[in-house]
Each structure stands twice: as structure tokens, then as C-alpha cells.
A protein has these predicted regions:
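Short alpha-helix plus adjacent loop in nuclease-associated cores
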Residues: 145-172
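A short, structured active-site edge motif that brings together acidic residues
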Residues: 52-55, 137-155
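Acidic, Mg2+-coordinating catalytic module of metal-dependent nucleases/exonucleases
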Residues: 109-116, 120-121, 164-229
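Substrate-recognition/cap helix-loop segment adjacent to the acidic, metal-dependent catalytic center
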Residues: 116-145
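Short, polar/flexible loop-turn hinges at active-site or ligand-entry regions and domain interfaces
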Residues: 80-87, 132-138, 191-196
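Active-site catalytic microenvironments for nucleophilic, acid-base chemistry
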Residues: 125-132, 153, 157, 187-188, ...
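Conserved non-catalytic scaffold segment of RNase H-like nuclease domains
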Residues: 2-125
Length: 229
């Protein structure tokens, strides 16, 4: 570990609905079954990766798992668990591993793309499994950051990005550029054929590139999910 490097964690989750009949996608109705992260620096260099499958949900909540948005990937998960690419373990042990990485690399900031969703679903899962004995997944000391929020500030208004979205019809109903991780990565990488995998660690690998691109703009950004009081 290099004390001159400011290490950050980029994290992503995949979820299944608690109540499949509930309309809309809201963090309070989601359980985390896949959690992956990478320890990175602002230049996108990767120092450690983790890829976990939450056994408490993946094994014990089969009805919910059968309603997961990417349930067709379940056989892939089993193959990767057997090969050792993913670790099947309890949610408590996933959190323990995160705390270990935070301590080892002296991490003070954790990022996700649309962190509001990941933050909410991790807390929902934590509260469900501990019967609200423990209510928050991330330590209180961690600064919670959002690359979607950053992208709105330093990418969305770039003429090059606006033109890119217009040319490829990546626009919202209001005619503004969309800022999904998949579209942003297509813009950054120049790979129009890229399709997001929608598994935890794989998505982290594109989200850390979004983080890198935002930092490369050398502009003042409000990175934190929630504004300070």
C-alpha cells in the first residue's frame, strides 16, 4: 500500500424485489443478492476487487430471487461460485470484508453510480436481516459519493456528450441526455456495442471509468450523495 495514494471504493449491487407486485423500483422494496467492489484511485487503477453473493437472500429467499430483474443470470452465478470467481457468504461477512478493506486502504469515500439506490438497498437488506439491530451498512465515518451526481455536473452539459446522445437517441422524454452507466461508458470508451453486464463487480469496472473521467475534467464537483447540513 502506498501512503501517497488516496484510495477509494467503487461499489455496485444487484437486487431482487421483496414484494414483486409492488409497482416501481424503490430501494425500500429491494434486497441485495450481489455485492461487488473495487479499491481504486482517481486514475482508475485497481488495487483490490471483491465479488460476493449474499447467501441470506440468494439461497434463503427463492421466491424473491425468481422475481429478480436479471434472474436469467442465476445459472451464471452458480458457475462462478463453483469456479471461485464469486464468494457465496452471509451478508454479515460481506460487510466484514468491506470494513477490512476500508481499514487496510484507509478509505474515506465510497462511490456508486446512482448511489441513492445502492445505499438504500444495502440498508434495507441490513435492517431486514438484523431485524433493525443494525440499520446502516456503511460506517458512519464514510463519505457517501455518487458518480451519477458527478456526471450531471461535469459531463451532461458537455457539447460533445450532448451531440453524442442526440446522434444515438440517448435522450430522456424531456430531450435531455441520459446518464446511465452503460451510455456513459459507451461515450467514454467509444464502444457503441458495449452492453452492461448487470452483475456487481463487472459493473464496478465501468463505473470506476466514469469516476476517472469525471476527475479528469478538473472541475469543482459536489460528489457527496447528501449535502452537508
Amino acid at each position: 500500500m502506498n501512503n501517497k495514494i488516496k484510495y477509494r471504493i467503487v461499489l455496485d449491487t444487484e437486487t431482487c424485489p421483496i414484494d414483486k407486485d409492488f409497482e416501481g423500483v424503490t430501494p425500500s422494496n429491494m434486497w441485495v443478492y450481489d455485492c461487488g467492489w473495487a479499491v481504486v484511485d482517481r486514475n482508475g487503477n485497481v488495487y483490490k476487487t471483491r465479488s460476493f453473493v449474499n447467501a441470506d437472500i440468494f439461497l434463503n429467499e427463492k421466491i424473491a430471487m425468481n422475481s429478480a430483474y436479471y434472474q436469467n443470470k442465476i445459472p451464471k452465478y452458480w458457475d462462478e461460485i463453483k469456479s471461485g470467481e464469486r464468494i457465496l457468504t452471509s451478508f454479515a461477512k460481506i460487510r466484514k470484508a468491506l470494513l477490512e478493506d476500508i481499514a487496510k486502504f484507509k478509505v474515506t469515500e465510497i462511490y456508486a453510480h446512482n448511489m441513492r439506490f445502492d445505499y438504500g438497498t444495502l440498508n434495507t437488506t441490513q435492517r431486514w436481516l438484523t431485524k433493525s439491530k443494525y440499520r446502516y451498512f456503511f460506517p458512519k465515518s464514510i463519505i457517501i459519493c455518487d458518480t451519477l451526481k458527478m456526471s450531471r455536473q461535469v459531463i451532461a452539459n458537455k457539447k460533445k456528450y450532448i451531440d453524442f446522445c442526440k446522434e444515438n437517441n440517448y435522450l430522456t422524454a424531456r430531450g435531455t441526455p441520459r446518464l446511465t452507466a452503460e451510455i456513459l461508458y459507451r461515450f467514454i470508451s467509444g464502444n457503441q456495442d458495449f452492453t452492461e453486464e448487470h452483475t456487481g463487480l463487472a459493473d464496478v469496472m465501468i463505473e470506476k471509468e466514469i469516476l476517472k473521467y469525471c476527475f479528469k475534467q478538473h472541475k469543482k464537483m459536489n460528489r457527496e450523495l447528501y449535502a452537508k447540513a
